């Protein structure tokens, strides 16, 4: 169910509320919501480094793959940065990684939106959201997260777990056990959060999701080693 009355928010929070500072690498490949993600994390006290090549990430404690746009152009841009192998090695080494929106979808093997292969880090595919009567398409607006397994990002019974979505495609992993939360879309359940060891990915935009987005980012930052 979409909730349209909550005002749109981008996180601008007090730095003093978060005393643990990290260097976070934000992958800049020409498809990301770089500005709003940067401002959100800086307001939480984090140092953000824009990553365009491998050497720039050597001092980072975590990497973020943001994304707004289409699957194939995003994969082409990533290929042109020579970062694909580095992203795969980063995740396989156990370092913290966060994918946001299109950044989640690129982690999969393929997408209905394009013909190119994805990163293939997560087994499964990205499917077109089905047309359902009385449901908005594309899926744009606020939805309440449903916890599907115990995880470090949301807690069962928490109030106001509403987050902001803008997407036309949704993730269908082969292993449903990595889905940490979903949202209702008519009779369908759409993947909202994937958590698998050091790999975290969300279909919604935490940087545009008010207090719930703040909580999500804080808990992820707390888990960074």
Say what each PLM segment does.
Residues 110-187:
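Pocket-forming structural segment of enzyme catalytic cores
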Residues 48-59:
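Short acidic low-complexity segments
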Residues 69-140:
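Cysteine-nucleophile active-site neighborhood
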Residues 25-44, 207:
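N-terminal beta1-alpha1 ligand-phosphate binding loop
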Residues 21, 199-225:
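Acyltransferase
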Residues 188-195:
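Short, surface-exposed beta-strand/loop micro-motifs that present aromatic residues
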Residues 6-7:
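Cationic, low-complexity basic patches in intrinsically disordered or flexible, solvent-exposed regions
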